[in-house]
Curated annotation (Swiss-Prot):
It comes from Rhodoblastus acidophilus. The keyword Hydrolase does not apply. Keywords: Antenna complex, Bacteriochlorophyll, Cell inner membrane, Cell membrane, Chlorophyll, Chromophore, Light-harvesting polypeptide, Magnesium, Membrane, Metal-binding, Transmembrane, Transmembrane helix. Disulfide bonds: none annotated. The chain crosses the membrane at residues 14-34. SUPFAM superfamilies: Light-harvesting complex subunits. One of its GO terms (biological process) is photosynthesis, light reaction. One of its GO terms (cellular component) is plasma membrane. It is a single-pass type II membrane protein. The lineage of its organism: Bacteria, Pseudomonadati, Pseudomonadota, Alphaproteobacteria, Hyphomicrobiales. Coiled coil: none annotated. This is Light-harvesting protein B-800/850 alpha chain. The core complex is formed by 9 alpha and 9 beta chains that bind bacteriochlorophyll and carotenoid molecules, and is disposed around the reaction center. The non-pigmented gamma chains may constitute additional components. InterPro entries: Antenna_a/b, Antenna_alpha, Antenna_alpha_CS, Light-harvesting_complex. Residues 1-13 are cytoplasmic.
Length: 53
């Protein structure tokens, strides 16, 4: 790890949850942005159009 000295400044009990939490928030924001600005993504989540028999 080339940034191993960061843990001498930031306690791992604070830094690791903060890092994982920020990654989670960014992922949720990206999904919401795609969901609200495209038409194909909501259709993809719905599984496509079903054909009537």
């Amino acid at each position: 790890m080339n940034q191993g000295k960061i843990w001498t400044v930031v306690n791992p009990a604070i830094g690791i949850p903060a890092l994982l939490g920020s990654v989670t928030v960014i992922a949720i924001l990206v999904h919401l942005a795609i969901l609200s600005h495209t038409t194909w993504f909501p259709a993809y989540w719905q599984g496509g159009v079903k054909k009537a028999a």
